[in-house]
């Protein structure tokens, strides 16, 4: 694990909570008078953020909880909840250009996400904080950050463009800067390890 990534990374629960906040803030940008180009960018951002978030949880966070003996109905339901979110994302994408139908699908997606967020933040994350301890949660956060950078890197330009379209100018510049910095960091890490990323 790269020590720079480790130092810069939030703990796993903090990262998950930040992801939840980001996605919910994107949902709140979708107003009836949102211009179509901005709306499309926000919808793409929501879908990408949810897909990346779910993949990181499934690959790193949930297995670590299970290995540590955490048992929770919410943890057992997390996989099916992610599957439901993925199906709704596909529906949202398939309805592109059909505003009313897509709005209805987005509403269903938002409800599914809110239910999952509530379960995660009231049951799964508190259990992780009780059972895993600060050092393990920091390690998981660093691994999740590294994986996020790997997943974002091939789509960085697309994600940055959507963030820029869907955000105020100051926020967009900060987001683009963060994505560029993340890409440079991953390239540097890859060179040090002798990999081409």
Task: Tell what function each PLM region has.
Residues 1-197:
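Small-residue-biased structural context
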């Amino acid at each position: 694990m790269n020590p720079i990534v480790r130092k810069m990374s939030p703990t796993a629960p903090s990262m998950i909570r930040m992801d939840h906040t980001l996605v919910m803030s994107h949902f709140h940008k979708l107003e009836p008078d949102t211009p179509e180009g901005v709306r499309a960018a926000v919808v793409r951002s929501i879908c990408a953020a949810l897909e990346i978030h779910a993949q990181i949880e499934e690959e790193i966070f949930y297995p670590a909880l299970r290995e540590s003996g955490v048992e929770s109905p919410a943890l057992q339901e997390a996989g099916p909840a992610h599957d439901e979110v993925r199906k709704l994302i596909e529906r949202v994408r398939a309805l592109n250009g059909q505003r009313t139908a897509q709005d209805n699908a987005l509403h269903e997606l938002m409800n599914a996400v809110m239910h999952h967020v509530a379960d995660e933040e009231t049951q799964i994350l508190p259990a992780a904080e009780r059972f895993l301890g600060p050092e393990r949660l920091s390690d998981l956060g660093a691994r999740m950050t590294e994986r996020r950078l790997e997943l974002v890197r091939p789509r960085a330009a697309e994600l940055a463009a959507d963030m820029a379209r869907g955000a105020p100018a100051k926020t967009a510049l900060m987001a683009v800067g963060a994505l560029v910095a993340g890409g440079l960091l991953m390239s540097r890490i890859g060179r040090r390890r002798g990999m081409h990323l």
